[in-house]
Structures are given as structure tokens and as C-alpha cells.
Curated annotation (Swiss-Prot):
This is Condensin complex subunit 2. Residues 204-213 have a biased composition (Basic residues). It is found in: Nucleus; Cytoplasm; Chromosome. Regulatory subunit of the condensin complex, a complex required for conversion of interphase chromatin into mitotic-like condense chromosomes. The condensin complex probably introduces positive supercoils into relaxed DNA in the presence of type I topoisomerases and converts nicked DNA into positive knotted forms in the presence of type II topoisomerases. Early in neurogenesis, may play an essential role to ensure accurate mitotic chromosome condensation in neuron stem cells, ultimately affecting neuron pool and cortex size. Residues 1-62, 178-214, 652-673 are annotated as: Disordered.
Amino acid sequence: MRIPRSETMNSSFLKARGQQDVLSSPLERVPPASRPGKAPLGTPKTPVLEDFPQNDDEKERMQRRRSRVFDLQFSTDSIHLASPNRNIDVSTTISKFTNTQITEHYSTCIKLSSENKITTKNAFGLHLIDFMSEILKQKDAEPTNFKVAAGTLDASTKIYAVRVDAVHADVYRVLGGLGKDTPPQGEESHSGDGSTLETERTKKPAKPKKKQSCKTIEQNLSNINVSEADGKCAVDPMFQKTAASFDECSTTGVFLSTLHCQDYRSELLFPSDMQTLSSGEPLELPDLGFVDMTDLEASLQQCVEDRPLCPSLAGFQFTKWDSETHNESVSALVDKFKKNDQVFDINAEAEDDEEDVPDGPLVEDFVDNDEPDLSAAGDHEEFRSWKELCQVQSNQEEVISLEDRDIQVMCSFLSMKPGEYSYFSPRTMKMWAGPDHWRFRPRPKQDATSCTEHKKKSAKKDFEINFDDDIDFDAYFQKTKAATILTKSTLENQNWKATTLPTDFHYETDNLIQLHLKPGKRSLKMDQDQKAKTEHYEEIEDYDYNNPNDTSNYCPGLQAADSDYEEADDLFADPVGTLDLESDPKTTQENGHISPENQGVDITTYQELNLVAEPQKVNKIEIHYAKTAKKMDMKKLKQSMWSLLTKFSRKEADTEANHTESGQEGAPEEVADEKKLSGLTKDLQTRLPPLMAQNLSIPLAFACLLHLANEKNLKLEGTEDLSDVLVMQGD
């Protein structure tokens, strides 16, 4: 027998004694006084080891667990709510509770009952049933409160019901464990020398399980087959709408003209899948890397070595400079310029202009009028004004000082390769579009006095308010003719769309120069310096208008007789240049006289050159076709045709139709003799209503006859010349 330790024994003894004074353990079914070997509490004598029973470790563990659970559950409640105890001594417990503690315990029970928090864990710690007599004693002095009594009975009933459920569950838990076989435990035997012998466990061999044969053929087909609703995938509604509106007779595909691709993958997407702006991150483009230029290094070095840095100073020597050689080079350069045809002679006289120049300064030298002014067609000065030379005296020239302009700005207008008279870049001067766009206009003559009056600026008067004057307020507050409120159109225009900027989608501008199918390559942007280097307009020669391509393919642009274009005869006067209108055969015929040179000559001949005339316009021919679909009641058409085939009257045909609609089938009818389709069509014109008779055609009648042949077992045969169809009853 194992001897227990003294510390364990003493602790277990003290703990057992301390708990027994307050509340007994729920597993103790025997009263405390019936325990053998227990010393009374009042004994001053020190307990002897022989007086105590054997120590039970399992019981101590259970007591420690219950005390820990009790502390966790009732930490906020009164200290007198003890651990669950089903065999509690009511007389000893009630005597130790004061009236205040009983009142607190009563309020706690009522609160838990109202909140429905009475469970199996705290049901045995609530002593409302045990304190019922004490509560009634306290309430005897007061009149009976039925509301308090009802709440007390309700809480007591809940506590008792939960206790019964807990006992019932424990009993079934114990009964469930009775039928189970406990595993065999190894028995320990102590030998005389203290060695322990353990018996080996005998393991029974596991029996092989028999495989049960089951049917693999499913009898219910609904468990195997998938329903049609589950088999159909989700169809895009836009796809259904587009497919429904597809015309099978059209030459274009159903989706090729409407679907679009979004990115470089060229994947066709439906409109519902399209994204206006991509919300994802941009694709990372692969690095193009660097190009190896080591092979070109040797050839580039050879080009640099052979060329001088400054060709104009190639022969100049700092230490061996000679004035004679310098003068010779300068004289040679001067002779070169003198031999040039375009040498500017300062002492030369100015050439006189044959045309008259209007006196006085010019007003509105440039008028921003893009359209030609045809109202003053008779004024010769209007059409030769663009050829006039602007002669401005030296004293009227406006001199721009360098202080007002930056040298860097002025250099941007200069040409990269200036000539003797072309210092500015033609690209900059392209803003002048010529005489058709900008035209010089003569300035009207003004008197000297009027010029001086315009120069004088009117002095600006200071704003003053005189508070002494009498103000007529009626003039300011009288009802005016002008509207004082905003009109409806003004309010509609001044809406939030007119004053609010569009939504900024933060679109990447780099996508504009990015190729669609090859996003790795981009369009190069040329700087202004590179553009200026590539623009060598000075090296381009004048265009030769007399080249064979233009002279052979020239089209005079002949005008038709009903043309709206009319030109005044005085527009082509002598000052600008005489134009022979009689050279155009079309114009000579309109004027009423034909020159003998043009008689008998084709109108396409113009100055002994065979030219292609303007093609003739084809008259617009309107083709009549059916622009709207024909509507036909096929059911009524079939009834009328069947009545004609069976020689029924119209009234009998209607009665038969009513019988068939109500579900009563009449006697089957047959075709008596042969009928022709052409005759049936003519008879149908009189039987049908006017609108249906107008829409009736041979194809519709033949389609109706085919339906009847299928339903009524008719036989159709064609004539020998295939001009008509014979209808007869089938076998």
C-alpha cells in the first residue's frame, strides 16, 4: 500500500474541512457526521496520522476543478453563492445568511430569470427555493404583493426545471457508459526485491471486413442527367438582342461590324464587356535594351580624322600671318560677289511702277477676310491692290530697338542656311497665306485736322458724388420695359453642364503615341532643333508646272449649262491680264457667237490638246420595291382556300371555323375535283377583305397551299409547261 505524503495529506485535510464548514461537495452523498476517523473541530489535540483515512487524489482533483469553475462563474455575485451542491444542508446554510445577503441573492435570482440566464451550470448555486420561507417571513408585515409572488414562483420554477434536466442528462450519461467495455489495464506486482513485473497485453487479430456488394446501376435517371436549366450558361442580354436583330440576307456579318477590340490582343468583346477606361495597372513593357555600336566605331573615327574642324580657317597660321596673302584672299572674295547676278546696287535708281499708288498712308493693311469680296467686282483697284507695292517713307518706318526684343527670340526666326536675301526661315513665313487670304486695301484719305483730333485723348473725369443734390428716386424705381428677370432660355443655358468641367479620367497621354498591336514600340517625338535641321526649304527648287504629267492630264473643269457659277465679265480686265473668253467653246456658245476656228471641233479640244471631258451625270432612277412588310392573316387565308377547294359557301366555312375553335370536329371533307392555283388565287381576291386582297401574292398563296397539302393530305402536280399547279385529293 502506498504511503501518502504529509504535505498532500495536510492540504487535502484542511481543504476538505474548510469546504465542509461552508458547503458540502456534490459527490458526498453521506452526511458529514457519518465519516469514520474524523476528528472534531474543537479538539485541541494535534491530529495523528493514524486517525485519517487513505488519501484520494482523484477526489482532490475534482474538488479543485469545481472550486475553480465556481470562482469564474460567480465572481460578480455574492460570496455565499457556493459551488454546485445537490445535497446541501439547508438548515446550516440559511442560518449563516443575513437578511441583506438574502435580499441580494433574491434580486440576483430574479434578474437571471428575467434575462433567461439560468443554466445547468448555475442552477444548483441559486437557493431561491430554499430561501422561500425566509422571504415570506420578511413579507408578513407588509400586504401581499402578487406581482412579487408571481415573479418568485416563476424564477423558482425555472431553477427547479433546469435542475431536473441536469440530473436527467447525468443519468443518461452514466447509463450510456455502462455498456462500453473498459480496456484491460496492466496489473502491477511488487516482488520481494522491489522489482515490478508488467503483464503483456494480448492483442486479438483483427477480423477482415467483408465487402458488401452494391448495385452500381442507377435506376433513377434524374440523379444522373443534368437539367436543362442547369446546363444553360448565362447568356449576355446584349448578345441575345444583337442575334435577334440579325438579318440573314445582309452581306455583313452579325458581329463583325459591331464588335470592337480593346487592346493589342485583338480580342473581340461584346459591348457589355467593354471598359471605357482601364482600371487596372498598365502593362510593364519589356526593356528594348541597347544596340551594340562597336562595329561602327572604326568607320566613325575615320570620318572625323579626315575632316577639318573649321574649313574657313584651315589655312590660317597664327605665327606666319602675312598681310599680302590676307589682302589677296579678301580681294578674291569681293570679285566673287561682283560676278554674281543678284548683287545689290546701293546707288541704283528705283524702278517706276506703272500702276498708280494711292496717296496717303494705308489703313488696315491686312484685313482678316477669308472669303473673296465679290460685291466690288467692278472696282479694278480692289483686284490689283494685292500687287501694289507698299512704299513707306523712311521717316514713317517703325524701328524696333533691341531693348524691346530678346536676341534669343529673334534668332529663332532666322534660317539655318541663309542666302543673300533670305535671312528668315520660310517655315516661319508660312503664316502669310498669299493674296487670297490677306489683301492690301487702300487707306481712305483723311484731313490733317481729323488726324490731330484722334490723337488727342479725352481726359477721364473723376467720379464724384454730390450729396447736396436732390435725387429723383421715381426715375430710378419706375417700371422699365426691359425684363428684370432671367428668361427661361437663359436659365436652361446656365446649368451645371455649362459651368462644370468634364470629369478628369487621368488619361495617360503616352497611350496616344503607343502602337496598338506593338505596345513595346512608340512613335518618336522630334524636338524643335531636329525639325529645324531637317527643314531645308532653301534647297528645294521651284516647281515646274510645264511637266508632261500636268500638261497631258489637265482637266479644264467644264461647267454645265445649269451651273450656278457665274463670273462677271469685267473681273478679268486689262489691268490684271486679258483672258480670251472665246477660247472656251462652252462660253462662246453661251454668248451666241462661235469663232470659225472652233466650228467642227470637238468640245474637248483646248489649245490643240486632247483632254478628257467631265463625265456625264447619270439620272437618278427610282426603283419601286416593297418598303414595308406585308401583313397577312394566314389562318383566315387557309380557311378561305379550303372552302374554295371543297366548294363550301362562305357561311358554311365560317360555321366550320367556329366548330373547330370550340373543339367540335366536323366530318372530314375532301377535294372533289382538280383545282388550279391560278384560279384559286383569283377567287381568293373576292373572298378576302380589301387589305388582305391587296397584300395577297402568288408566293403567299403557294405557301398556304403547301400547309393545306400537309394537313389535308392533298396532292400537288405541275403542268407540262410548269405554268400552273394542279391540286387534287391524295390517296
